[in-house]
Amino acid sequence: MSLLDRPLVVVVLISALWWACSRHRRPAALGRLSVVAAALAAATVVFDGPHWQLVPWQAVGVAVGLVAAMRWWRPGRSRRAVRVLGRGALGVGLVVGALALLTASVPQLPTPSGPHQVASQIFRWTDSSRPETLTLDPSDHRQVVAQAWYPTDTSRGRRVPYFEAQHRLPSSVAGLPSFMYAAFGEIATHATFDAPISRTQRRWPVLVFSPGLGVPREQYTALCTELASRGYVVVALSAPYESAPTVLAGGRVVGQTVHPDVMGPPPHPELQRLIDIRAADAGFVLDRFAALAIDNRHSPLAGHLDLHHVGIVGHSLGGATAVQVMATDSRFKVGVNLDGKLFGTQPDARLHQPLLWIQSDDPRTPEYTGGRDRLLAGLRGGGDVVTVRGSAHMSFSDAPSYWTATGRTLLGNSAGTGSVALAAMTRTTADAIAAFSAPALGMAATATMPQVLAQHASLRREPLVAAAGV
């Protein structure tokens, strides 16, 4: 909460209860308190924005000011109507406000647990070999935006904000109105910009990360920074025009203009088109990183990326992208699919790289399980399938931090964020990814998959791999 938020709640609570419950009011004192409540409500809207945890309190603050004004304006005939309507409205507002504070929180990201501090650098490139097919401008070329999270030995430097475009958000972000993200400027990412990469080893393995459909790359900051603190260079890709906000080269902010029919019947050609674009983005990023040491000596990453040990991780549509990338680009040595349903010909891929499938505890459709099992049956490089108990589809993002513990228990499953706290979900997911991918990426494993399963009671290994003959 900001400096104004707590006074707002206290003053609004006192004045609203006074109006709603007291039979012996002191109009002058109550009127002045109501004016203060309305002023605080207006001030928080102006300076902090109408973020979701405080909207009911801001509304009640304005309401008590209006009730006071109405009593002064028409102290006679309207007194009874004002009293009845005012008590009811203020009572409802207080209940809603209390529920908002009880269930919704200003998000806080867990501190990364690895031995390294975390730094970040953002890259913006144009792929002149590919036209941009998601805009109507025939002269557009594909712009690729990548944010690298990497290990560093220092915590000093300019802090990385949560949303790069925090003050230029479009009207909607990940399907929610932008005012709900007003408090996200307070989120600590536990990372600094452009710090030197850690000198504890010469080169670092790379994990490319592909986000879910319509979800900004920033909303996976907890997982990306956790993996970076353990010694990976995690390259989170934006998906311009299908997620918002994305800051392109030159500083232009674009929103979500692509809305594919995700609920339509198979084969989902629109989604397959997006997967093809994302897969090409991932390959292009590796090409650019290969040239980084020559083209950009000023980057902290130049000369320090182990491009012989590259993996890919993706959530939801990003998970399907990871499978496609593995099937078409042998530079990626290992892959992780976080609850991603497959599309098109992906279930028939014969992957020669190991694949880890981490799925949520959500009910699964026949289309999901059918595609998954067909892919597992054709694996050539080995694999594993685990379920995180209590998780939901969006648990792999930062979304669980939007709720308090009470909110997760009451609303987490219906909201698609599950009942697992973000810190626990991040640690569990990162432990599984690190244990599974370490051999393929030349890392010294701190734990094996059986050890990770023993350490985390929330992880359940599925018998699907053995049944599929992997």
Predicted features by range, described:
Residues 100-207, 415-422, 435:
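Domain-level recognition of soluble alpha/beta enzyme cores
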Residues 333-395:
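The feature captures the conserved acid-bearing segment of alpha/beta-hydrolase catalytic domains
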Residues 241, 248-304:
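Alpha/beta-hydrolase active-site loop
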Residues 86-88, 377-470:
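C-terminal catalytic-base region of ester-bond hydrolases, centering on the histidine
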Residues 78-105:
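Internal/C-terminal transmembrane anchor helices
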Residues 28-72:
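Membrane-embedded alpha-helical segments of integral membrane proteins
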Residues 285-350:
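Primarily recognizes the serine-hydrolase "nucleophile elbow" in alpha/beta-hydrolase
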Residues 187-247, 364-366:
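Short substrate-entry loop that stabilizes the transition state in hydrolases
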